[in-house]
Amino acid sequence: ENAMTHYMASFGTPSLQCAMNQLSNHDHSRFLTRTNHKVGRAVNLGTQAASEGINRGVMKEAVIVQMTWPGAPTLYYGDEAGLCGFTDPDNRRTYPWGKEDKMLIRFHRDMIRIHRENPAFCTGSVKFLHGDRNILCYTRFNREQQFIIVINNDGYTRNVEVGVCGAGVPKACKLTQIMYSTEENYSMAPVTYQVEGSYLSLTLPKYSAVILRHLTGED
């Protein structure tokens, strides 16, 4: 949280809104490979090691941040299909035709649509709401839309209580889930969460994330 705030302060608003938000690129190991915490190169570990022990839950968490944080989300080809690889040149493998991770492709498509259809993610304000060990919660909002994003990057279930007055939502209101991701899959089912006394309580399983939405005037 502190690092993100510190580096954002170096950008003017126009620069921040068009900054390339990347998880992978042609110079570094692919993000999905980094979720297995193996340090090394293909020449030492072998190319297969890049795909061993990966965590798709962490990958989906990162994509949710990528698509809801200020800036221009930028995909490195193949990330959306589950392509792995250590640092250059292993990170420049060909697209995995016929072996794509179809779930990750659907997830990226849905997250891109969420980003594109909601102006608050493009030009809205951003504010941290809550931070704890392996827990991140922030809001993106404008006058019409308020979103709360909660990430559990822990290896076990966490109960989280978040003060949401900084998101500009009423002290008592309903929030609608528009994205919920876990290690295994994801859901866009419109589950309702209740805010009472400006606090939101929720339980998140390990390596999961949720995006909640409130629209001005809907309560």
Residue ranges and their predicted role:
Residues 1-73, 130-134, 143, 196-199:
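Alpha-amylase-like alpha-glycosidases and glucanotransferases acting on alpha-linked glucans and related
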Residues 8, 95-129, 211:
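Aromatic- and carboxylate-lined catalytic core of secreted/periplasmic carbohydrate-active enzymes
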Residues 191-219:
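C-terminal beta-strand-rich structural cap/linker in extracellular carbohydrate-active enzymes
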Residues 26, 66, 78-80, 111, ...:
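Conserved, mostly hydrophobic/aromatic
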Residues 129-169, 211:
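Carbohydrate-binding surface patches
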Residues 28-32, 83-87, 157-159:
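Short catalytic/ligand-binding loop motif for oxyanion handling, primarily in non-cytosolic enzymes
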Residues 177-197:
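Solvent-exposed beta-strand/loop surfaces of large extracellular or lumenal domains
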Residues 25, 77-85, 127-130:
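Short, solvent-exposed turn/loop segments enriched in Gly/Ser/Thr/Pro and often Arg
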